[in-house]
Amino acid sequence: MILPRTNDLDFLGALVHARCSTMAEGECLDHLCRLHNLSELGAAVLPGVEFLGTADFQHRLVQQLVQELSVYLGYLRGVGAEMLNWVLSRFEVENVKVLVRSLATHVPFQECQKYLVSLPYQPKRTVQLAQGTRSLEALIELLPSGMDALRLKKLWNNHREPFRPFFVEAVLDGTYFRELVMRTGRLPAEDREWVTPLVLQEVDTFHLMLALRGKFHYGLTPENLLPLHVRGTRISRGRFAEILAAPDAATAASRAGDRVMDAVPHKQEANTGESLEVAAACEALSWKRFVRLAKHAFRHGHMALGQVFGYAGLRRVEVANLITISEALRSGVSPAEIRSRLIPRVGMEASYV
């Protein structure tokens, strides 16, 4: 149950500090990577919780995060509450992306219901998502208020054939990020100081992945991708156009440079396989910077929104890491290899910029 809005940042700060002390990071992650199976992992991170396989374990991790952030929402009001509410709305967007994939693979929506996340403040939304929706247009109606429906329809209609889930999901992400940037700009100056770097880092990671994966892997053109640019970040529209015009993934990464990463991967010859390697390396380096910024906001944001959103960012990374570990344990990957896949990654070669 969500508590009444009190804007009690002192109490909320105490809550997130207590939770952060139990977060799976550092040596704790090293230990989890050495576990033998999913049962041991579940006992370590979800003690006393029964789950049915890897997918159910992962779903419970995400649902737990949603429940936690929903409780924190009850301690905020005004622009802080609006901002955290939009962070939670990201999970509604992710629900729609699950259904987009079901459209592409012709899997009945009802079979996807187990993968959808339920938001406590909108208990009926998940059921609505999985019932009777048979088109992209119908899915738009189920997106959270704040998503620009007209923009979504225009972009989708311009690139309807062939149906490309990557592009549809990118349109959803870009539209979500536009609103996220706008809500960040409404925060008080003392809060923007801590929250803005986190938001811009995530959005510019999105920009870079549009080029590295959208162009060099999925074959989308700069004309397809340039309209997805989100204004107000460190990668301007002009710079984004230069990144999209790069002849290979390594050049595109170098053109993004320190706007997204503290380091860039060593330049490699451009072919399909190595382009994917560049994309994976850049994504890891981008999220490594995100973790650094989130920790800085959490530790130095005092009893302000920066601390709350820094913590929320760290929790998202924690969940992503635990999901990665669960997948690797199912596949029988070695502990060293598992650790190399986590955020922040270890043992990566890079050229500093």
Residue ranges with predicted function:
Residues 1-353:
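N-terminal domain-start signal
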